[in-house]
Amino acid sequence: MESTPPRFGLDCRNRNKKDVNIRKQKEILKVDKLKKLEIKKLEDQKKLKEQEEKHRLTLIRLANAPPQTNSINNNNNNNNNIKTNRPPLIYGEDKDKKSLFPEPQDYDVDEPTYETSFCVKLGPNGVFQHELRFTNANARENSDIQKAIELSLKQTDVVIVKNPNDDIENDFVVFNEQPDEREKELEHWELMDECSSSLVNFVTTPYNFSEIEFPRLASTCSTQMLKKNLNQNNPWLNSKSLIANISQK
């Protein structure tokens, strides 16, 4: 007669698996969950108190601050004027009416409208003519600028030329023209061409005779190898025609 397995106790469980007390495990998980909920509740309460305190301080600061409605309105009006109204940039006299009004490229966005820019135009007889309208609110400063302009135009050492536009344009080009890179190279080679023999020596000497800068080169390589390296690796010899011309001179 076969023996029946026990219905209760540890003997009824699979001995290959680990024995687990499920009820105790559920209680532990429940306690951990309650702890996490309690911690989250405390953190939420702390954040709420901080927000309330911050809001209270903001209300106090706004209550103690002076009213700013007028200045805000003035700023808005100034901004509107800057965007919509053209600054009066009418200088000199000209038959072409279009030149009396500024073009879009004439506006300087970095310069406030209350500052005055000054420029002069040349009349048909080579005489400087000027007319400017100040937008600065400081009348004393406007007067000083006007006097300085009048004094500068009355200087006795000013030379009136026959073709002022051409001469001034040429002077301006010469004064502002950047040196050409090709001119720099020509000047560089001209200086070295004055001592062409020294240039040839400078090209060949470091690779052949300098034991201080290249101590291993002369001792480990033969003369043929030196000539080969000289032709292949020397940056001064990239242009063979240049060296040939210098050598001929």
Swiss-Prot record:
Coiled-coil ranges per the record?
A: 30-65
Its keywords, alphabetically, are: Coiled coil
- Where do the segments described as Disordered lie? 66-97
Q: This protein's superkingdom?
A: Eukaryota
Q: What is this protein called?
A: Uncharacterized protein DDB_G0280211
Query: Organism, per UniProt?
Result: Dictyostelium discoideum (Social amoeba)
